[in-house]
Amino acid sequence: MKKRFIFITGGVVSSLGKGITTAALAAVLEARNLNVTIIKLDPYINIDPGTISPEQHGEVFVTEDGAETDLDLGHYERFIRTKMTRKNNFTTGSIYSEVLNKERKGEYLGATIQIIPHITNTIKKRIISCAHNVDIVFVEVGGTVGDIESLPFLEAIRQIAIDIGRENTIYIHLTLVPYISITKEIKTKPTQHSVKELLSIGIQPDILICRSQYTIPIQARSKIALFCNVLKESVISLINVDSIYKIPKLLNLQKVDQIICHHFKLKVPPADLSEWDEVIYNELNTNNVVTIGIIGKYIKSPDAYKSVIEALKHGGIKNKTVVKIKLINSEKIEKNGTNRLNCLHGILIPGGFGHRGITGKLITVEYARINNVPFFGICLGMQIALIEFFRNVIGLKDANSTEFSQNCQHPIISLIPKGNRNLPNINNNVKKKLGGTMRLGNQTCYLKQDSISHKLYGKNIISERHRHRYEVNNKFINKIEKYGLKITGKSKKNKLVEIIELSNHLWFIACQFHPEFTSTPRDGHPLFIDFIKAAIQYKKIKQK
């Protein structure tokens, strides 16, 4: 199969939405019956984002095969049907690590190791390895053109055009075209300088996607085309929109997919964007509004809970409901009480690590349980729900997790037992390092047939993604059924608790896995869809 690559770079400033633009463009080409995939190149020195603070870098997106990756891979999976793997995201750190390991083993036969060719060849090899059985590979280069960290990646993608032919590569450059409100002018100079910087590296962009507050007029586009040496029709205006799911249509209307297919000489049908039209229709034609509270400790950066936020919106789309999301600091609940929870129609506690903010989360679970507020616990959220239940319902006041109190009398939650660590991606050497030491990726879960979860999924066996190193201590689970808390999902051979449900409650479900990673705007996810449905019901009850 012929190898074709589209390389996407960014200029002027960061945070232009390069990942979303890449994903949306891939979605349009997928809608033309093309098989596409996307790679993200991250220029930081970390091996992966697994140990980076969510407040700095946003969430860690977990793939089916257990890779801890950049949050942009979440955007990719939400826009296209292709599932990402560990091959779809790599960092400068992982490249250097691979090269240095080979050098230590003597695989370079005594050669002096250099950026060119050793680092760039390793980058090229990884990129090209993703081109099997796909029509087009999109490659998003992280960072901004001009950053020193991105130079090896840019050099590698420059060389790929030489290796496989310019006719099999397209370079797309995403830039900012600012609007100056005082003079009421759109300024093209930053884009010109950004392209000049890219040209100095040896890359001539074929398409310019210009991010702007307003539609860029034809005159300004013609000027950009002239000074940046691109065709006028290849200067694309991408304005700010109220929904990212409108972007595929915006790109299609400006015939970006047609330009790409013409360059690659691909004879494919027009893009069928009917599924995206349905998503937008459901977003615009809503019947309800609900407010969902996400209770966490990384609320300064909404990107820390990106997939959860998007999954809640998907649940809203499927219920034709506007979902308003409040990010609430659990530490403030601990200090100031539960008043700020009174306006919520549903409460969600997402995954997390460490003891900070735990007391506020325990207070929140108790509030939701007592007041019949729909509650959804994910990963740590399930563990918190169990600790609260053991303390306040069963009466084990010292119930805790060994993550928060190593010597607690009743360790309801503890490290995954050694006997269960023969699962994929588990590293037994937890104390010596943090990176790559968790139960990661897709794991099988067996559902109890008379449960809500079984009804929602419509099957006996499911597979969901995990990211945790602590689990429910099986020594204590026999006590909970008689108090009304049901274990409705377990891992293979009943080793680990995966889902719990509270009886006699409007909606109280918690799971050890991360369902947000598999939710999409076109399909949603059964747990999130039903959670929003319960929030709508709770709002109606509350209004009576």
From Swiss-Prot:
<feature type="binding site">
    <location>
        <position position="469"/>
    </location>
    <ligand>
        <name>L-glutamine</name>
    </ligand>
</feature>
<dbReference type="GO" id="GO:0042802">
    <property type="term" value="F:identical protein binding"/>
</dbReference>
<keyword id="KW-0436">Ligase</keyword>
<dbReference type="InterPro" id="IPR017926">
    <property type="entry name" value="GATASE"/>
</dbReference>
<protein>
    <recommendedName>
        <fullName>CTP synthase</fullName>
        <ecNumber>6.3.4.2</ecNumber>
    </recommendedName>
</protein>
<dbReference type="GO" id="GO:0005524">
    <property type="term" value="F:ATP binding"/>
</dbReference>
<feature type="binding site">
    <location>
        <position position="352"/>
    </location>
    <ligand>
        <name>L-glutamine</name>
    </ligand>
</feature>
<dbReference type="GO" id="GO:0004359">
    <property type="term" value="F:glutaminase activity"/>
</dbReference>
<feature type="binding site">
    <location>
        <position position="14"/>
    </location>
    <ligand>
        <name>UTP</name>
    </ligand>
</feature>
<feature type="binding site">
    <location>
        <position position="223"/>
    </location>
    <ligand>
        <name>UTP</name>
    </ligand>
</feature>
<dbReference type="GO" id="GO:0046872">
    <property type="term" value="F:metal ion binding"/>
</dbReference>
<feature type="active site" description="Nucleophile; for glutamine hydrolysis">
    <location>
        <position position="379"/>
    </location>
</feature>
<feature type="binding site">
    <location>
        <position position="14"/>
    </location>
    <ligand>
        <name>CTP</name>
    </ligand>
</feature>
<keyword id="KW-0315">Glutamine amidotransferase</keyword>
<dbReference type="GO" id="GO:0003883">
    <property type="term" value="F:CTP synthase activity"/>
</dbReference>
<dbReference type="InterPro" id="IPR033828">
    <property type="entry name" value="GATase1_CTP_Synthase"/>
</dbReference>
<feature type="binding site">
    <location>
        <position position="140"/>
    </location>
    <ligand>
        <name>Mg(2+)</name>
    </ligand>
</feature>
<dbReference type="Pfam" id="PF00117">
    <property type="entry name" value="GATase"/>
</dbReference>
<comment type="similarity">
    <text>Belongs to the CTP synthase family.</text>
</comment>
<feature type="active site">
    <location>
        <position position="516"/>
    </location>
</feature>
<keyword id="KW-0547">Nucleotide-binding</keyword>
<feature type="binding site">
    <location>
        <position position="72"/>
    </location>
    <ligand>
        <name>Mg(2+)</name>
    </ligand>
</feature>
<dbReference type="GO" id="GO:0044210">
    <property type="term" value="P:'de novo' CTP biosynthetic process"/>
</dbReference>
<feature type="binding site">
    <location>
        <begin position="147"/>
        <end position="149"/>
    </location>
    <ligand>
        <name>CTP</name>
    </ligand>
</feature>
<feature type="binding site">
    <location>
        <begin position="187"/>
        <end position="192"/>
    </location>
    <ligand>
        <name>CTP</name>
    </ligand>
</feature>
<dbReference type="InterPro" id="IPR017456">
    <property type="entry name" value="CTP_synthase_N"/>
</dbReference>
<dbReference type="GO" id="GO:0019856">
    <property type="term" value="P:pyrimidine nucleobase biosynthetic process"/>
</dbReference>
<keyword id="KW-0067">ATP-binding</keyword>
<feature type="binding site">
    <location>
        <begin position="380"/>
        <end position="383"/>
    </location>
    <ligand>
        <name>L-glutamine</name>
    </ligand>
</feature>
<dbReference type="Pfam" id="PF06418">
    <property type="entry name" value="CTP_synth_N"/>
</dbReference>
<keyword id="KW-0665">Pyrimidine biosynthesis</keyword>
<feature type="region of interest" description="Amidoligase domain">
    <location>
        <begin position="1"/>
        <end position="266"/>
    </location>
</feature>
<feature type="binding site">
    <location>
        <position position="223"/>
    </location>
    <ligand>
        <name>CTP</name>
    </ligand>
</feature>
<dbReference type="GO" id="GO:0005829">
    <property type="term" value="C:cytosol"/>
</dbReference>
<dbReference type="InterPro" id="IPR004468">
    <property type="entry name" value="CTP_synthase"/>
</dbReference>
<keyword id="KW-0460">Magnesium</keyword>
<feature type="binding site">
    <location>
        <begin position="15"/>
        <end position="20"/>
    </location>
    <ligand>
        <name>ATP</name>
    </ligand>
</feature>
<feature type="binding site">
    <location>
        <position position="72"/>
    </location>
    <ligand>
        <name>ATP</name>
    </ligand>
</feature>
<dbReference type="InterPro" id="IPR029062">
    <property type="entry name" value="Class_I_gatase-like"/>
</dbReference>
<feature type="binding site">
    <location>
        <begin position="187"/>
        <end position="192"/>
    </location>
    <ligand>
        <name>UTP</name>
    </ligand>
</feature>
<feature type="active site">
    <location>
        <position position="514"/>
    </location>
</feature>
<comment type="function">
    <text>Catalyzes the ATP-dependent amination of UTP to CTP with either L-glutamine or ammonia as the source of nitrogen. Regulates intracellular CTP levels through interactions with the four ribonucleotide triphosphates.</text>
</comment>
